[in-house]
Amino acid sequence: WATIDECEETCNVTFKTCCGPPGDWQCVEACPV
């Protein structure tokens, strides 16, 4: 997703979280450390 807001809108319903460089947010189980 382009923005974390867009990502969270989609990911929060699946109980996942958003990680990634700005402009390329991904929906993941957990952020890599």
From Swiss-Prot:
The modification 4-carboxyglutamate is found at residues 6, 8-9, 29. Keywords: Bromination, Disulfide bond, Gamma-carboxyglutamic acid, Hydroxylation, Knottin, Neurotoxin, Secreted, Toxin. It is found in: Secreted. The presence of a 'disulfide through disulfide knot' structurally defines this protein as a knottin. The cysteine framework is VI/VII (C-C-CC-C-C). One of its GO terms (molecular function) is toxin activity. Expressed by the venom duct. Signal peptide: none annotated. The modification 4-hydroxyproline is found at residues 21-22. GO terms for cellular component: extracellular region. Its main location: secreted. The modification 6'-bromotryptophan is found at residue 1. It comes from the Eukaryota. Induces sleep-like symptoms in mice of all ages. Disulfide bonds join 7-19, 11-27, 18-31. This is Bromosleeper peptide.
